Design a protein with these regions (language model features):
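Short, structured coil segments at secondary-structure junctions
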Residues: 116, 136-138, 197, 228
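Active-site phosphate-binding strand-loop segment of PLP-dependent enzymes
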Residues: 142, 146-202
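N-terminal "arm"/small-domain region of PLP-dependent enzymes with the aminotransferase-like
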Residues: 2-65, 199, 231
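Conserved N-terminal alpha-helix of the aminotransferase class I/II PLP-enzyme fold
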Residues: 53, 60-101
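Active-site PLP attachment segment
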Residues: 221-241
């Protein structure tokens, strides 16, 4: 929203700048060229000639609305299944599942993995989609200060006691690359705690997929702990735009 002297004049409303021109690091705003710091097109693939060519060919072959409908009705295709297999192989996991978009994906994953008996331990700077997903969770949850591994261990001790009482499991949630600060989650240290605690690890790697690790395989690959991460959440919206 507006800052400085303009904040008082905004009456609480956000502004919506109108950018013009091709998506890129430099675009036109109010008749002059400006640097665009707001794009998610990390690798510039949205402008790549091969990507544009494939996009045009797919639109000509299948139309602009295909596949139309939810996957459980009329929206499932062999291309979905092929892409899921290729993505799973790329990041080193046995399987993958495509969802419509990132925010909904994380909320759905959390809701799918947890029951009211389960306990969650999560980083205080987890993305808003994680927080919204946790709001649907009716069980206990414990937060630890950002990247504070001593505090994370303490919360795992609390979570273990609660899980023993409820008969549930423990899910730890963190990010590979934190979107607000740009620092890395301490995945190697969290995975190491599995020697002392019984939990599953869900990593939101929206910003790390395509940019971190061997060949862009993500932050878990960067730390060499892919096998220790139980569920990887990635998105096409950042590096694959």
């Amino acid at each position: 929203g507006p800052i400085g002297q303009y904040q008082k004049l905004s009456h609480g409303y956000f502004s919506f700048p109108k950018l013009e021109g091709e998506i890129g690091p430099r675009m036109m705003f109010r008749g002059r060229e400006v640097l665009n710091w707001s794009l998610n097109n990390y690798l510039g693939l949205a402008n790549h000639p091969e990507v544009r060519k494939a996009d045009a060919e797919a639109a000509a072959k299948f139309g602009m609305a295909a596949p139309m409908g939810a996957r459980m009705m009329s929206g499932q295709t062999k291309w979905h299944e092929q892409l899921e297999r290729e993505l799973a192989a790329f990041v080193g996991k046995p399987d993958a599942f495509l969802l419509n978009y990132g925010y909904q994906g994380m909320v759905s994953i959390i809701d799918c993995l947890l029951t009211r008996r389960d306990v969650v331990v999560y980083d205080s700077e987890a993305h808003a989609c994680i927080i919204d997903g946790l709001r649907l969770h009716t069980g206990k949850r414990f937060v630890y200060p950002h990247n504070d591994m001593a505090a994370c261990r303490k919360q795992l001790e609390h979570a273990t006691k609660v899980a023993q009482e409820t008969g549930g499991g423990i899910l730890v949630i963190t990010e590979g690359v934190f979107g607000m600060k740009g620092d890395l989650g301490k995945l190697d240290e969290i995975v190491a705690m599995k020697k002392d605690f019984n939990f599953r690890l869900l990593v939101d790697d929206a910003h790390g997929f395509g940019t971190m690790g061997k060949g862009g395989r993500g932050t878990a690959s960067h730390f060499g702990v892919t096998d220790g991460v139980d569920v990887l959440f990635n998105t096409f919206a950042k590096s694959m735009a």
